Amino acid sequence: MRMKKQYATLGLALALAGCGGGQAVTQPTDTTLSQDMDTAKDAVGLERLAVAEQQYRAAGQRAVARDDVTAIGDAGYNLATVQLDEGKPQDALATLTATRSALATRGQTGDDAGLDLVQAGALHRLGRDTEAAAAAARAAGAQDTDIVEKAQFIRGLIADDSGDQATLASVDAYFAGLTGKLPDSWTADGKEIAARNLLVTGGSTQTAMQDAMQAATIRQTQVDYRNMARALGVAGRAAAKAGNAQAAAQFYARASQSARQAGDKASADRWAKLAGTAVAADPFALPTPSATPQKK
């Protein structure tokens, strides 16, 4: 059974690995495994991540029954990616560790750049940026250009958050050097990195704000709301640095509300704090139960 890579936006826009299709298959196909993988991928597209997690776990169990090293790697990678997008980075790391062990048992001992990529994202979420940067650097050496692009992007995020201006500048140069027709997601990543680099190097805050908003607009179109919210947060930083406190508060409020609805509570709380009193009431929130007087 041959597996192939399929790319989809998910949280940090990581790539999902898919099963079957697109190539001639010269041996019998395990339809149960294929259906589990396809059902999980469809669930991701509908943002039903709990269902996707369940189906990728089922796919992995089927892959173990089949003793299929490629399918085990794909299912483990996908399961960890979904767990990361669910806000469960510790679970993602546990899945990655177990997947690497299962692969090694079957003779695959070489480093897997895809697993390194997800590991970098999980470690970054946990604030373990030194380890995250090392994992992202390993992933950036992959042969797969999609993994390289996303690894470079994560390197830039880590560098900005940890004050590593040299690495952030090198990542900005990587994106600036890309040529030809690029995927929209790459353009958005490059714009966000450019905005971040401008803000730490004393560049134009207006350009930084424009770059961040271009990234946000692309991600809105791609239904990539978590990454869109983060770009809005960068626009807030640019407005704050420009001295426009009102615009900054509004950007932070928008980022906070979007992130909260997308399930990213930690980021939502952080941006809400930066927005201060500018956080508008959510018109779609459930009404707060009113206290009713107790009868005596």
PLM feature segments, named:
Residues 2, 7-10, 14-78:
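N-terminal leader/linker segments that initiate helical-solenoid repeat arrays
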Residues 25-27, 65-68, 105-108, 141-144, ...:
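Short coil/turn linkers that connect adjacent helices within long alpha-helical scaffolds
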Residues 52, 92, 132, 167-171, ...:
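Single-residue signature of alpha-solenoid repeat helices
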Residues 46, 66, 86, 126, ...:
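Structural motif corresponding to the intra-repeat A-B loop/turn of tetratricopeptide repeats
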